[in-house]
């Protein structure tokens, strides 16, 4: 499997995005956000929805050749779905939950990205024909422990959130340039604009923060730990007292 850099993946996403803009559905029109369904059409894939696990920990599956996938019916009985190599299978409960639209869109693009990378590097991906996306695999930490998942995550992020659409959305959402500190408790105005931007682009706040951080549009990301600012102030006060 090739170990692509972020720069390599950005170049791939730019090529795919250029082709997307030429589709008749969006050609010569103002694009506000990426449609995962239209992106699937571009790369010759289709989508189906099934219940993929009993506890919701598996949200997407795809493969490059025929493969039987275990799914669950409405009575929680195991059945099998036959993937044909051109299908992205996404969890039905995730699809039906409108509050999870951003997570759903990213899942679709993650599975699509596996297929795009396989098509670009067929000899490298022949040994790995089956992909399952777990929530716990949305991991961007270093060192990279799973290059296949990291590359799919990175390409999905770049495809779903092109730089020009983020800048355009920032303007529409009243964000004036780079967000120096993303913090919902202590920088509420910027955070409100950021939240509106995530909704506008159809993505989760987590995915958007990671993408904007990479693009240099966010300085400090306190999305998960908003009280970190208070802790920093306390540390500085303690240091001052100790001197």
Where are these regions (language model features)?
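Active-site hotspot residues in diverse enzymes, especially metal/ion-binding acidic/histidine motifs
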Residues: 1-243
């Amino acid at each position: 499997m090739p170990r692509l850099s972020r720069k390599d993946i950005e170049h791939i996403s730019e090529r795919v995005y250029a082709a997307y803009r030429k589709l008749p559905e969006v050609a010569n029109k103002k694009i506000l956000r990426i449609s995962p369904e239209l992106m699937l059409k571009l790369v010759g894939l289709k989508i189906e929805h099934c219940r993929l696990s009993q506890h919701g920990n598996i949200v997407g599956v795809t493969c490059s050749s025929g493969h039987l996938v275990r799914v669950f019916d409405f009575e929680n009985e195991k059945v099998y779905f036959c993937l044909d190599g051109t299908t992205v299978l996404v969890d039905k409960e995730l699809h039906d939950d409108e509050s999870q639209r951003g997570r759903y869109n990213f899942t679709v693009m993650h599975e699509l990205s596996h297929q795009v990378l396989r098509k670009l590097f067929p000899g490298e991906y022949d040994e790995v024909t089956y992909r399952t996306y777990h929530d716990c695999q949305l991991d961007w930490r270093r060192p990279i422990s799973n290059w296949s998942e990291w590359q799919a995550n990175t390409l999905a992020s770049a495809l779903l959130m092109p730089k020009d659409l983020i800048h355009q959305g920032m303007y529409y959402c009243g964000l004036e340039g780079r967000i120096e500190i993303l913090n919902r408790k202590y920088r509420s105005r910027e955070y409100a604009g950021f939240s509106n931007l995530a909704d506008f682009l159809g993505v989760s706040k987590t995915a958007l923060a990671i993408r904007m951080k990479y693009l240099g549009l966010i300085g400090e990301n306190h999305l998960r730990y908003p009280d970190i600012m208070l802790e920093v102030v306390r540390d500085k006060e303690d240091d001052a007292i100790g001197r």
